Amino acid sequence: MQLRFLQKNKEEKDMIIAVAGSGGKTTRVHKLAQYYRSLGKKVFVTTTTHMKKESDTVIPENIEDIRKQLNETGYCMAGMPATPENALVQKIGPLPEDFYETAVKEADITLIEADGSRGMPAKIPADYEPVIPENIDEIHIVIGMSALGKPASKVVHRLSLADKDLEIKEDTILTPLHLQKLLKKGYLGPLREQYKDTKIKVYPGQADTLYQRVIARFLQEEKDVAQIKDDWFKIQPKLVIFGAGHVAIQLLRIAKFLDFYTIMIDDREEFADPEKLSQADEVYCRDFHDIEDILPEQDNTFYVVVTRGHANDRLCAETVLRRPYLYLGMIGSKGKVAKTFEIMKEEGYSEEQISTIHAPIGLKIGARTPEEIAISIAAEMIAIKNHETESTMSKELFETKESGVLCIITKKSGSSPRGVGSMMLVTKDGIIGSIGGGNLEKTVMEEAPSMKEITRKEYDLSNAQSATLGMICGGKNEILYVPV
């Protein structure tokens, strides 16, 4: 749908920008307003649909109200009331056409919120949406990254308009590919067909995590999001150790060296002592019947059962079997394990469930001492972790809000030290994470700051170049540079 507004002379310096989509339109409008005001421009903000009324929003009785605000402050958001006075959230709607035309003449920059999504981060627009003025200079399309990983019924406005091409149903868990299809089919395709001479760009919003920021960059540059795997962005697994005896303490030390987030639980106060277990991230003294609320929700959690008694071992194992996990290991001799499994079968646990328990725990290396047993357990955990996931992401990298260039190994051959999915973030102050060290990492660090857009580059570590980059055995790495 189009509204007939002022026909601008394109040679004028003034600009009209429409912001459409969902999941951050108002934030985008404010960001643009702040930028242009910093350049000394007079900025006028309004809507062709509706937007939230703010404390400084002008509800004009006449055009002089808008003109005065613009001239005195260099900024004016204006619109007509669109909700009852007693509404919890007050909104404004479009201005009368003559008010709008005069305000555009007075302002250097006009910013228009041109779409509605009822607070949802994603939207499938109707045929009459977004509502774009005829004299538009730029159209910015927003989509919220907070929709990723959530069911469509909870995060997509006008979901009933989804067709077969979008492959989105009510229970569909949204992936980057869904969002990219939605952008292309719902916004970019139709708008570029209708506004052939208008600059139309994607500006994703609500990108908080590193994964969301990477996907946002791919959507913004309109690059294929299938190049990115979400498995690469899973934090190193959490480890829950039931029991805090000799083996548990040695395993804790190794787990911290391996960068596991570690939770220790014991039912004895003298053992569940935070001072004695200072390397642990969390320590709990709890009866093993009462631990459900302190166990992690993430499905790549490792559980190790090393309590002081058979009954507690079984209780802990049964608790874990009722929740998602990546690894469950239980200490004990073959005889003890067989007896425990027999009781569990009698209690109704299936052979399939019981077969997921690694017991006796650890790789068979003839371990005898607590230190050796801990090493055998850690080795088995590493084997499971590296078989099931490609992520080597540290907690620091997972949680970072730093800007920079993310460098990801997307292909490898030969004996290069790090696998596919390994990554480091090159910031203005240094690096977070690693792609294997050596001269290869040094070279990538040096080249990263010059990467202003998503770029792939292959490093051949064979023969002469191998020696140059410090790789003795050679191989190839493909690095994906992503500014975030």
Where are the language model's segments positioned?
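N-terminal phosphate/diphosphate-binding loop that engages ATP/GTP or pyrophosphate donors
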Residues: T26, A33-A87
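Walker A (P-loop) phosphate-binding motif
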Residues: Q2-L39
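Segments forming oxygen-rich coordination pockets for charged ligands
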Residues: Q220, A226-D267, P274-K276, Y284, ...
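Hydrophobic Val/Ile/Leu positions in short beta-strands of Rossmann-like dinucleotide-binding domains
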Residues: V19, V240-I241, V305
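Short amphipathic alpha-helix with an adjacent loop that forms part of the alpha/beta core around
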Residues: L6-N9, I66-N71, F288-D299
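ADP-ribose/adenylate-binding Rossmann-like module
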Residues: I265, F302-R308, E318-I343
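Conserved catalytic-core segment of NTP-binding enzymes
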Residues: L88-F99, V104-I109, D115-L219
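Adenosine-phosphate binding glycine-rich loop
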Residues: I331-L397
